[in-house]
Structures are given as C-alpha cells and as structure tokens.
Regions:
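A short, N-terminal "cap"/entry segment at the start of jelly-roll beta-barrel domains
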Residues: 18-86, 171
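Ligand-binding loop in jelly-roll beta-barrel domains
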Residues: 132-137, 143-167
C-alpha cells in the first residue's frame, strides 16, 4: 500500500513537472505606458470651459482596443442622459470635482443619434441608481448602460478607460 502511494505521488509530481512549460509573450507590444506627466500635459492643452472627451492613447491589445481618455465637464454645462449603443465598457477615475452619476434605468425621452455610430440622448433617466462621485472614486459602466451626471458641485476632470471588444476606436 505504501509503495502504491509513493508511486502515485511520484507520478503526480512528474505529470505536474512535465506540464510546466515556459510562458512566451505574444508578438504584441508588451505594455503601453502613459505617464502622469503626459496626462497632466494633455489636460493642460484642452480648452477650458467646455465638455470634452478626448483620447490620450488608444492601442490594439491583440483582438480588441483599449483607450485612455481625458474628460472635462464644467459645473454649469448642460447635462444629457446618454446611451452608447456599443459593447464598450467605460471605467471612470475621478481626478477633480464631484457630482452624482446616475446609471441604469431608462431614458424616457431618448433621441436617436444625430450621426451613425453616435449616442442616444435624453434629458433624464427613470429608475437608475445615483452615486455620489468624488476624486479617487472609480465607476465601471458596462456598454449599453444609460448614464447621466447630475448635481455637479464643481468643474470635473476625470480619466475614462474604454476596453473596446468591437474595435470601434481609432488608434492613437
């Protein structure tokens, strides 16, 4: 019995050792580095007082694209509910400012996009969930999820990371 257990144990370890193989990186860029200085310089070049959503970098990561965007949203800017008809998730990292972000629910007065590939918009969201967002917070909004900024307390700047399985973003 002891010999059988020893043989089985040795066979198990040999199988594990044989299954281990070197990991080879795919033939894509190993990583993309966007530095703090690059981000700050990018924001500094944006014109003040406007809603802007501008790509800092968009890269192909092997089968899909990922974008890093700089967003500015002045306190007194008009706010629309928005719905992106895409699988692209938005991961928001708030840098400055605070407001409530309403996600989910429905846009009862939704207007179709003004151009192909554009967004559905409206004036409000019914049945959504409101969250107070402050600097340092992260919000993950799946594609095809209505969202709306409300009660903006101060000018906002934030980063949005957009994994794009449909490949709709332009490389930058």
């Amino acid at each position: 019995m002891k010999l059988t257990a020893t043989i089985l144990s040795a066979g198990l370890w040999l199988g594990v050792a044989a299954a281990q193989q070197p990991v080879v990186a795919p033939k894509t860029a190993p990583a993309t580095h966007v530095t703090k200085d690059q981000i700050q310089e990018f924001f500094a070049k944006l014109p003040p007082g406007r809603i802007l959503d501008s790509p800092i970098r968009v890269v192909d990561v092997g089968g899909y694209k990922v974008g890093v965007y700089a967003v500015t949203r002045p306190k007194d800017s008009p706010q629309d509910a928005i719905y992106h008809d895409t699988n692209m998730t938005e991961i928001l990292y708030m840098l400055e400012g605070s407001a409530n972000l309403i996600t989910g629910g429905t846009i009862p007065d939704g207007r179709p996009p003004a151009r192909p590939g554009g967004n559905f918009t409206g004036t409000k969201i019914d049945g959504g969930t409101s969250r107070h967002v402050v600097p340092g917070d992260v919000i993950i909004t799946p594609g095809r999820t209505p969202h709306l900024w409300a009660n903006i307390e101060s000018d906002m700047t934030y980063l949005v990371f957009r994994p794009d399985p449909d490949g709709t973003q332009q490389l930058r």
